[in-house]
C-alpha cells in the first residue's frame, strides 16, 4: 500500500510539473508574439493609401489577427464610409431642438443604390432591412435591428474574417497554411500587414478622427 501510494504521489507530481511547463510555455509564446507584433508596428512607416489593394476583408483579417484593431464593428463603419464615397449612401445631417432649447445634431443615412462588392452588398441588405420602408437609416435603427437579429451582423463579420484569411493565403501571405505570428508571414504578407499598421499610425498621429464630419471621408477613396 505504501509503495502504491508513493507511486501515485510521483505520478501526480509528474503530471503537475507537466501542466506547469505547458502553462509557462503558452504564456511565454503569447508574450513573445505580442512583443514581435509591437516591434513590427513600431517599425511600420506611415501609409496614406487604401491598404491591401482596397480588399477590405484582408485588411479586416490582418487588423483582427495582429491586434491592430480590437473592435470588429470597425469593419461596419469602414464599409459605410466606402459606400458613402461611392454614392451608394447619402449622409444627411439634421438639427433638432431638444429639452431646454438645446440643439442636437443627428446624421441619417439615405440609401441610394446597391454597391458593387459582395461584402458591401451584404451590409447594404442589412441596412435596408434596418431602415424600413422610408429607406433612411436613422440613429439607433441599425443598433436596434442588430439587437433583434444578431446573426445578421455576426455572420457578416465572421464571413469577412474567413474570406480575408482565405484571400490572404491565396495571395501567398503565409509561409504555411495560416498563422498568427509575424514569423508566419512571407515578405509579401509582412508588406500587407505593414500597410494596415502604417495607416493606423498615420490616422492616430495626424487625423483628429473624433472631430471629423462624416462628409470628410475622402481619405478612404482610392
Q: For the regions a protein language model found, what residue spans apply to each?
A:
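Acidic, Ser/Thr/Pro-rich intrinsically disordered cytosolic tails and loops
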Residues: 1-222
Amino acid at each position: 500500500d505504501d509503495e502504491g501510494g508513493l507511486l501515485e504521489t510521483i505520478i501526480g507530481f509528474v503530471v503537475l510539473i507537466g501542466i506547469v511547463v505547458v502553462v509557462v510555455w503558452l504564456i511565454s509564446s503569447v508574450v513573445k508574439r505580442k512583443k514581435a507584433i509591437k516591434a513590427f508596428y513600431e517599425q511600420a512607416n506611415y501609409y496614406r493609401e487604401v491598404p491591401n489593394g482596397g480588399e477590405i476583408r484582408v485588411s479586416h483579417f490582418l487588423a483582427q489577427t495582429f491586434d491592430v484593431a480590437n473592435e470588429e464593428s470597425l469593419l461596419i463603419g469602414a464599409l459605410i464610409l466606402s459606400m458613402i464615397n461611392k454614392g451608394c449612401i447619402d449622409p444627411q445631417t439634421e438639427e433638432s431642438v431638444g429639452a431646454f432649447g438645446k440643439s442636437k445634431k443627428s446624421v441619417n443615412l439615405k440609401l441610394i443604390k446597391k454597391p458593387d462588392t459582395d461584402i458591401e452588398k451584404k451590409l447594404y441588405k442589412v441596412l435596408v432591412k434596418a431602415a424600413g420602408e422610408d429607406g433612411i437609416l436613422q440613429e439607433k435603427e441599425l443598433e436596434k435591428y442588430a439587437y433583434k437579429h444578431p446573426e445578421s451582423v455576426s455572420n457578416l463579420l465572421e464571413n469577412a474574417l474567413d474570406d480575408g484569411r482565405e484571400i490572404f493565403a491565396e495571395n501567398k501571405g503565409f509561409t504555411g497554411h495560416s498563422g498568427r505570428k509575424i514569423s508566419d508571414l512571407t515578405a509579401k504578407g509582412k508588406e500587407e500587414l505593414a500597410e494596415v499598421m502604417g495607416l493606423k499610425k498615420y490616422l492616430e498621429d495626424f487625423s483628429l478622427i473624433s472631430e471629423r464630419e462624416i462628409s470628410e471621408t475622402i481619405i478612404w477613396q482610392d
